[in-house]
Amino acid sequence: MDERLILEAGRVKDGLRVLVTGGGSGIGASVVDALRSAGAKVFVCDIDPSTSPDHVADISQGQQVEEMFRAIERDLGGLDVLVNNVGIAGPAGLVDEIDPNDFDEVLRVNLSGTFRVTACAVPLLRTADSGLIVNIASTAGIFPYPYRSPYVAAKWAIVGLGRSWAMELGEDNIRVNVICPGSVGGPRMDQVIQKEAQAKGVGEAEIRSGYETQVSMRRFMDAADVAGAVVYMASPAGRHVSGQVLSVDGATESLRSS
């Protein structure tokens, strides 16, 4: 056993060049902080300029994505790791209550945006010593969530993309994994609960309790829990981990299926 791999599970190669989309807040910001603490050089993309990203971009717009990658090549000189984190929650409601335009927006950002970014990143990752793509999906990409069908559709697709890319890109020494977070506490989850409560005509406390009881630990996760999984995958200890869908969810999946 190479004990160095165990010791290095929380460290990455010094100067590892990483792009994190949606890195200005929430899970993305936690991933950025963790990777920087682990020794990486991180380029942050976000649509919100108030979060002070390295580059402001809407990843659903092809020209903006191309401009972002020109900035990455200028600032980093290449790329070793891509973390596809951008995602919007979208609407909540029954299928006949959701505006098709809102459905399209969720797919345009969460799915097409991820595809655009990855298509631009892969040529750079091929020139790295060892490339890595991490798709941040959701437990909504593993099993259904009523009233959240646009988001569920996008996240199931993100999981499928990740598993397919792992098979496509292995010969190029590019690993691809998917992380499926459970319910992460914070403003984003508060908005989800509010929308779902309105759609169902019940109180927010009831919705919140429902989410919490789906977790074996009976509490929401912290974004740092997801960030730790990303660091592991980017570390030497994760060098042969590819094609995996990792649930970081407090056993939400097993409780829902029991």
Segments the model singles out, each with a brief description of its role:
Residues 138:
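Residue(s) in the substrate-gating loop at a strand-loop-helix junction
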